[in-house]
Amino acid sequence: MKGYQTACRRLGVVALVGVLLAGCSENDRPLESPVRFEGGIFGTYYQITLVDPLTQGEANALEEGILAEMEDVDQAMSTYRDDSELVAFNDAPLNEWQPLSNELIEVLAISRSVSEASKGAFDITIGDVVNLWSFGPEARPEEVPSEAELSERMATIGFDAVEVDTQRMQARRLRDVFADLSGVAKGHATDRVAAYLDQEGIDNYLVNIGGGLIARGYRDIEDQTPWRVGIEVPQSGVPEAQHVIALEGMSVATSGDYRNYFEVDGERFSHLLDPRTGRPIKHQLASVSVFHPSNAWADAWATALTVVGTEQGMQLAVENNLNILMLVREGERWRSLASPAFVNYFGDALIDELGIEPWTASSANRQMQTGE
């Protein structure tokens, strides 16, 4: 009996060692490149593509870290979670300074900077008006609000009612406005994931969160093939690329009026609202892509420039040295306009190859003749 127990113990030890070895071999197993992580977050999707050589264990650890970065942003900036830091800020007493996390202060500061530079074309307090037009979480039918309803909601917005103290890392609301960071939080999450991958020593990757992109290194290390991104034709239906551009060590965010809208009596109402009027935009500028080292900045600027339209948008791009590409409706075709910073960054050869028009004084004159 004693010999039987000893044999059983030995068998158990052998079995346990076998399990441990199997676990080790699985973690050490090299994966085919590229490795992709995909899923849903912030009401949209994410796709992270890694080209560096990885084992299964390394990939598992990276995926866990990526999810933690995105969860941190959601915890800080979601307006759909009762436990988020932003919801607590919106519920805090008026005129009282609230200590906030570094990342929430950073995103509030970016938002304020773009709001001031665009003279209010970007405003994180527009949430109540977005809801009124049926594009927010508030359950409303898709209909045009009355003048009285719009006036009432417009009285509740204005970034001047949010003070941000970047020295003491605090902010406060001076009026009962509702701060909504959905126009920049996604870009901030893209930056966070990229920074995490940099920290972990990953050299070749593409981060895509809801269409906000950051590329590093190559998509094919051996051939040194750069990442290439498509700038969509700004129309509903199956996505189609108007231009394909190599993206190296840069991020891009695109804003457009063509995906999210509703129609009433044949008239289309875009989800992109002008915070200065409270109404959907009505001009021929269909999309703006902003290329910037930070996707949060690109996200905010893309929205602001799309709101103001072609001529004002290009003027802002020139004043702020922004690297942007616009797609403008001209009848049945699309006119592609590039800012001076875009031309300087990507070069004349690409401009000529893609048939993109550099913005000049004559471009402005033509725009005035054809109208927005």
Predicted segment positions?
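Mature catalytic core of soluble alpha/beta enzymes
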Residues: 2-7, 12, 21-372
